[in-house]
Structures are given as structure tokens and as C-alpha cells.
């Protein structure tokens, strides 16, 4: 995608008023609508940039190139192309899940663009290693991939409530909706890319101040990961823990998350 058409292809929107720019970047299985409960808290003081990852169900699947999006780097290219197309010089960046990973790499490539990284449900690696607890064994992940491939609908019905964690049926419905919007083959392909990614080796290259936001219990990211990030990220790093459970607090506990985001954003 060229800079010219990426804004249209990835449904880029800029909403709100204010001098400061805030990026809200969604995670796997959702699209920019995942921020709809968060947005009202920030549109009076920020110009908020929203976009859809190329894998999102809200994007024309023809844009998803299976030969290109084999690592996180092309997603980073997309983000930086959006930033450049909009003429943004500096912004605060909120990234959820895979978009937290994307933000990390983008900040290493172009640190001058980012005043603050706020990473929600972020893990540099989901698989366990000898001296690292990512939360998943390789065999467990392969079973997940097999379930997605065998019966995507059944997998979504099982995974959505597990990921949301908190007892918020509306959040489960919303997450299920956006998961179902994804083409199953794209969903599986992206899952493999994310679970095969390992950013541990580059964390020390991050120089942008970072706030890691986790929930009290997240099926995708063990609590120990936040402490790992605190000690391995290269920039000033703080860790905040929400008094809620689940991987999608923007859907299940938006008021609480918005409060934490306000506190974390540069003054």
C-alpha cells in the first residue's frame, strides 16, 4: 500500500480537538471500534488517530498479502506510513496486544515520533522459554491453531469469554463480533505470526518513556511479564495494574482504563 491510499485502505480517522495527538491502536481480533467506549474521554483534549490493522475484518481482505505480513515489520511500516501521511511530528501511542508489539518496534525505528508509549496487555513473547514465563507451551499453542482451523466458529465461542475474563456479556459479544468479522484463514495466519514473535532482544533499545498497563488476571499475559518488561525496557518504565480481569479492559472496564490512561499520558 502506498502512502496515498493507506489512509483509505486502513480506515484511518482523526477525531477530536486539541494540539496533542493520541494514537489508539487495537489488538488482534478487534478493530478500531474496540475503542468506542474510551474515545469520549479524550476527544476534547486530543486529536485521536484511529486505524484498523490490515488483518482486521473491517479491512478489505484483498489488502492482506500473505507473502508480506509474515512478521510484525510490515505492520510497523503501515503505522509509520500513516504517521507520515498525516504529517504527524510527535504523538502519544496507546497500543493493545499486537499493537503494543508494533509500537515497540516503531519507537525503536523512529523514537522522535513518540512522546510516550502506553502498552495494554503487552507481551514480548507468548511462549515459555528456559528463563522466561510467557504463559504458553508450544504444544498448547499448536492445539489452539488446530482448533481455529477445525472449527473457527466453535473456537471463537470458547475463546472470546476466556479472553474477556471479566463477567461482562456485552464485551464478550463485541469481541466475538469482531473475531467473526475476520476471515478465518487470516485470523489463523496472524495468530501464528504473533505467537512466533519474540521481542525480548530489542526491549533494551526502547528509549521512549513507557507505561505498561495490565489487568489483575489476563489469560494471555501472566503478571510476571509486566515485571520482566519493567526490568528490560530501555526507557523509563512504569507498570500499572487495573482492578479488573481479562485481556480487553477497553471493552470490559473502559472507565477504569481511561482513568489510568489519563494518568499515564504526558502532561
Swiss-Prot record:
InterPro entries the record matches: AB_hydrolase_1 (IPR000073), AB_hydrolase_fold (IPR029058)
- Location in the cell: Cytoplasm; Nucleus
EC number annotated for this UniProt entry: 3.1.-.-
Domain of life, per UniProt, equals Eukaryota
The organs and tissues expressing this protein are described as: Expressed at high levels in rosette and cauline leaves and at lower levels in axillary buds, inflorescences, stems, roots and developing vascular tissue of cotyledons.
Q: Which GO terms describe its biological process?
A: cellular response to strigolactone; secondary shoot formation; strigolactone biosynthetic process
GO terms (molecular function) for this protein are: hydrolase activity
Predominant location: cytoplasm
Q: What happens when the gene is disrupted?
A: Increased shoot branching. Accumulation of carlactone (CL), carlactonoate (CLA), methyl carlactonoate (MeCLA) and of their derivatives, including 3-hydroxycarlactone (3-HO-CL), 4-hydroxycarlactone (4-HO-CL) and 16-hydroxycarlactone (16-HO-CL). Corresponding hydroxycarlactonoates are also observed, such as 3-hydroxycarlactonoate (3-HO-CLA), 4-hydroxycarlactonoate (4-HO-CLA) and 16-hydroxycarlactonoate (16-HO-CLA), as well as methylated derivatives (11R)-hydroxymethyl carlactonoate (1'-HO-MeCLA), 4-hydroxymethyl carlactonoate (4-HO-MeCLA) and 16-hydroxymethyl carlactonoate (16-HO-MeCLA).
Q: List the active site.
A: 97 (nucleophile), 218, 247
Pfam families per the record? Abhydrolase_6
The UniProt record describes its induction as: Not regulated by strigolactone, auxin signaling or bud growth status.
What does the further note read? The initial nucleophilic attack of strigolactones by D14 causes an electron shift, followed by the addition of a water molecule, to lead to the release of the ABC ring product and the formation of a S97-stabilized open lactone intermediate.
How does the record describe its quaternary structure? Answer: Interacts with SMXL6, SMXL7 and SMXL8. The interaction with SMXLs occurs in the presence of (2'R) stereoisomers of strigolactones, but not (2'S) stereoisomers. Interacts with MAX2. Forms a complex with MAX2 and SKP1A/ASK1 in presence of strigolactone.
Q: What is this protein called?
A: Strigolactone esterase D14
Gene (UniProt): D14
Amino acid at each position: 500500500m502506498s502512502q496515498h491510499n493507506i489512509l483509505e485502505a486502513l480506515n484511518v480517522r482523526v477525531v477530536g480537538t486539541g494540539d496533542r495527538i493520541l494514537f489508539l491502536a487495537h489488538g488482534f481480533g478487534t478493530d478500531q471500534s474496540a475503542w468506542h467506549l474510551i474515545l469520549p474521554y479524550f476527544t476534547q483534549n486530543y486529536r485521536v488517530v484511529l486505524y484498523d490493522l490490515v488483518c482486521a475484518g473491517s479491512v478489505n481482505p484483498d489488502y492482506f498479502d500473505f507473502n508480506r505480513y509474515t512478521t510484525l515489520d510490515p505492520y510497523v511500516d503501515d503505522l509509520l506510513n500513516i504517521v507520515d501521511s498525516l504529517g504527524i511530528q510527535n504523538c502519544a501511542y496507546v497500543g493493545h496486544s499486537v499493537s503494543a508489539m508494533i509500537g515497540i518496534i516503531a519507537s525503536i525505528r523512529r523514537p522522535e515520533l513518540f512522546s510516550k508509549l502506553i502498552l495494554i496487555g503487552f507481551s514480548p513473547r507468548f511462549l515459555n522459554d528456559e528463563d522466561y514465563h510467557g504463559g504458553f507451551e508450544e504444544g498448547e499453542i499448536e492445539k489452539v491453531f488446530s482448533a481455529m482451523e477445525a472449527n473457527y466458529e466453535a473456537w471463537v465461542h470458547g475463546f472470546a469469554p476466556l479472553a474477556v475474563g471479566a463477567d461482562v456479556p456485552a464485551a464478550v459479544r463485541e469481541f466475538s463480533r469482531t473475531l467473526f468479522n475476520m476471515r478465518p484463514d487470516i485470523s489463523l495466519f496472524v495468530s501464528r505470526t504473533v505467537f512466533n514473535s519474540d521481542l525480548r532482544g530489542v526491549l533494551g533499545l526502547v528509549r521512549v518513556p513507557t507505561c505498561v498497563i495490565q489487568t489483575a488476571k489476563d489469560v494471555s499475559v501472566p503478571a510476571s511479564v509486566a515485571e520482566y518488561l519493567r526490568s528490560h525496557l530501555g526507557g523509563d518504565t512504569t507498570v500499572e495494574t487495573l482492578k479488573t480481569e481479562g485481556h480487553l479492559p477497553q471493552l470490559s472496564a473502559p472507565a477504569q482504563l481511561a482513568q489510568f490512561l489519563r494518568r499515564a499520558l504526558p502532561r
